[in-house]
């Protein structure tokens, strides 16, 4: 018998927890209200999510975003899900940051295949000065190709977000990963407040925010609701919300954990859509293990963005041709196909 999705057990060791992070009394989406959405009958939840989706995205298009690892492995953090953490034996070797032309070649390929957003990710705690200068050059180069630019570089210090904005960055990705009350199960080398502080610096610099989390790490339904509540109550909530399904990698502490029920993942997408109606809700890691039927339900629930390309940082992803075939089967258009020529020219702006 499969486990009750609302009571998924955790196989992760507990770390000492920091001061609790709580929602303000004036929260737009109190935890109880978000949890109530999760507990709706499935058809009722899907109906409400689809109504919300159609009201805010009448074209019904799906954004294709490509993610490139510009610096792989050797990270000093201890994220329990991550094969790039240096302390875990996962077969991922540390590599130096890519050269500018390597990044631009990948961006050109992404643009040619239909992607409209290009995200650059680095496995480190935070960027050093020499790294930031290289990333700034990458951002400028990708921007000149007419792509929306996104970067995920870990925690940012004062002034770093402003520099990225000046270089032409559109979005900064910095996920919350989980609900605050589950966070100590996942990582001990960074506090939840550190993540919130970085998001504050990003927003203050005038950048758009890409922020989501990971489900299927052993959290309960209430803790999944807690993650969505944290995201929905950011003021304003993120423009992009990547929802990752845990990809279990041998050698990481989360390897072998009980998988999340697929219907519970679809519920998470639907609740994200209802609580953050104008956001691009992105199907991120874990799509290869879902199959077409679960992904189709996710699109019905309000997902309207995917990471596109055969690799996400270090883990596998569906082939680009398979993604395009699935979208065609479902009658879904890509975001690029709905843009006018003028919009395409200023896509990166």
Curated annotation (Swiss-Prot):
Keywords: 2Fe-2S, 4Fe-4S, Biotin biosynthesis, Iron, Iron-sulfur, Metal-binding, S-adenosyl-L-methionine, Transferase. SMART domains: BATS, Elp3. Its cofactor is [4Fe-4S] cluster; [2Fe-2S] cluster. SUPFAM superfamilies: Radical SAM enzymes. It catalyses: (4R,5S)-dethiobiotin + (sulfur carrier)-SH + 2 reduced [2Fe-2S]-[ferredoxin] + 2 S-adenosyl-L-methionine = (sulfur carrier)-H + biotin + 2 5'-deoxyadenosine + 2 L-methionine + 2 oxidized [2Fe-2S]-[ferredoxin]. GO terms for biological process: biotin biosynthetic process. InterPro entries: Aldolase_TIM (IPR013785), BATS_dom (IPR010722), Biotin_synth/BioAB (IPR002684), Biotin_synthase (IPR024177), Elp3/MiaA/NifB-like_rSAM (IPR006638), rSAM (IPR007197). GO terms for molecular function: 2 iron, 2 sulfur cluster binding; 4 iron, 4 sulfur cluster binding; biotin synthase activity; iron ion binding. Gene3D superfamilies: Aldolase class I. Pathway: Cofactor biosynthesis; biotin biosynthesis; biotin from 7,8-diaminononanoate: step 2/2. Binds 1 [4Fe-4S] cluster. The cluster is coordinated with 3 cysteines and an exchangeable S-adenosyl-L-methionine. Homodimer. Catalyzes the conversion of dethiobiotin (DTB) to biotin by the insertion of a sulfur atom into dethiobiotin via a radical-based mechanism. Belongs to the radical SAM superfamily. Biotin synthase family. This is Biotin synthase. It comes from Albidiferax ferrireducens (strain ATCC BAA-621 / DSM 15236 / T118).
